[in-house]
Amino acid sequence: MLATACLVGGGTAQAATSQPCDIYAAGGTPCVAAHSTTRALYAAYDGPLYQVRRSSDNTTRDIGVLSAGGVVNAATQDSFCANTTCVITIIYDQSGRNNRLTQAPPGYWKGPAPGGYDNLADAKAAPITIGGQKAYGVRVEPGTGYRNNNTNGVATGDQPEGIYAVVDGTHYNQWCCFDYGNAQTDGQADSPAIMETVYFGADKQWGYGAGAGPWIMADLEWGLFSGVNAGYNNIPSINHRFVTAMVKGEPNHWAIRGGNAQSGGLTTYFDGRRPNGYHPMKKEGAILLGIGGDNSVSGRGTFFEGVLTSGYPTAATEDAVQANIAAAGYATAGGDNPQQGVQIVGGQSGRCVDVPNSSTANGTQAQLWDCGSGTNQRFTYTSSKQLQVYGNKCLDAYGQGTANGTQVIIWDCNGQANQQWNVNTNGTITGVQSGLCLDANAAATANGTKLILWSCNGQANQRWTLRS
C-alpha cells in the first residue's frame, strides 16, 4: 500500500499531564510493558527507570526520575559511575507487570558473555538530552541483548497488540537483528509467526524497502517484513536523527508506521493483511531488545523508550503518542556522534592503549600511543569483563598464555577466560585466567611500546586509568 502521512501537533500541556501509556490507556489499549532510560511513560510514575552496575566494586544503583512523570535523573548515574565504567543491568517495566528486561540468555545463537549470555550495554555510551536534561540511551553493539521470557499480560497467539520504540536513526547496521517487542520464549527459530517486533536497520536478507536503508520493519520470525511481500515493499529509507518506529498486529491485519521523534507526525508505511504463512500468528509473549528471537546478536542500534500494548491501537491514539514524543524534546548532547567506551591511559606514560593503524585483524598486538579521538583507542568494559574495541574485538592474551611476556592482542570476542580482565581499584588491570598484570613492556613510555602480561609488581607501567 502507498504510504500516507498524518501530521499532528504536540502541545506541552498534554505532555505535562499525560504520557504515552496514559494515552494508550485512554484509547482502550493499555501498556503491558513500558521501558525507557530517558523518562517516565506514565504521568504518575516516580519509580526507577533502570539499574546500573559499576566495574570498580560491582555495586548497583537504580536510576530514577527527577519528578513523577518526568525525565531521568542522569546526575545519579554520573556520580555513581564517575571514574569507572558502568553497564545497564535492568531496564524496569513501568506498567506494574514486572516485565523488566535483563541480560539475555543464550538461544539458538550464543552471546559472547560467559555461559552464552549476551553482553550488557555500556551505560555511558549514548548520551543525549531530553527536555533540556541529560539522559542516556541503551547503545546496542553486536553481542549486546536484553530479554524476559517469563512475562505477564503480553499478547500471545493471534491476540492484538501495538509496539513502538524511539531509536537513534544514525546508529544501525545491515545485520540481524536490532529488535524490540514480542518474541518466542525458548530462543529457537523453530517456526514462523511466533514473534512480532519493531526492527530498525538496513538488513536486506529478507524484506527491505527503497534506497539503501535503514528501514522500519517487523520481525515476525523466519523473516523481516517491510509489507505483505516477503522481499521488497515500497517503504522509504529513514533519515531522522531520532526515530519513532511502530508495528501493530491483529488477526490477519498489521501495520508499520513511523516518524521523526523530534517533530511532526507519523507516516503509515504499510497497512494490510498478513504475509502468507503468518495467519494466524502464534506469538509467545516474551520481550526482547537488541537481538533477534533466536538470540541473533549481530545487530546494532540505540534504544531510548518503547512499549507493548494490549489491543490494537487506533491511528488517533498513535498520533497522540507521537505528539507526546515530539514534545518530549529529544536532542543530541554535544554532537551527533558520541564516542563509545573509554580510553585506557598509562599511569607512567600518559599514553593510551591503542590498536596499531586502526587494524581490525586478529592477532594485532596492542601498544601505547598518544591519545587521540580514534575508535582504535576506545574500549568498552563489558558485563562479562571483556575490554571490547570496535564492538566485536576483545583484548586477548595470545594463545591463552599465562606466562610473563605473553602478548596482549585483539581477537574476535569469544567469551573465553583469556579475554576477561579485572579492572582493579589500585589501578591495575589483571587477566582473569593468568592473574598477571597488563604491562607496558620494559617500563617503556614511547609511542609503539607493546603491551604484554607480566607478574604484578606495583610499578607505574602496570597502572591504568579509564578515561571517558
Map each language-model feature to its residues.
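Acidic glycine-/aspartate-rich tracts in secreted/extracellular proteins
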Residues: 57, 95-97, 170-172, 250-252, ...
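Secretory targeting and sorting signals
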Residues: 1-15
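Residues that flank catalytic or metal-binding motifs in active/ligand-binding sites
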Residues: 46, 87, 134, 159-161, ...
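Compact disulfide-stabilized, cysteine-rich extracellular microdomains and processed peptide cores
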Residues: 41, 290-293, 320, 357, ...
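Extracellular glycan-associated modules
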Residues: 18-31, 40, 55, 86, ...
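Extracellular glycan-recognition/adhesion modules and their associated mucin-like linkers
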Residues: 336-360, 375-402, 417-445, 463-468
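GGW-centered surface loops in extracellular recognition modules
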Residues: 16-112, 164, 327-333, 341-342, ...
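Short, hydrophobic/proline-enriched secondary-structure or compact coil segments at domain edges
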Residues: 44-57, 136-138, 165, 287-290, ...
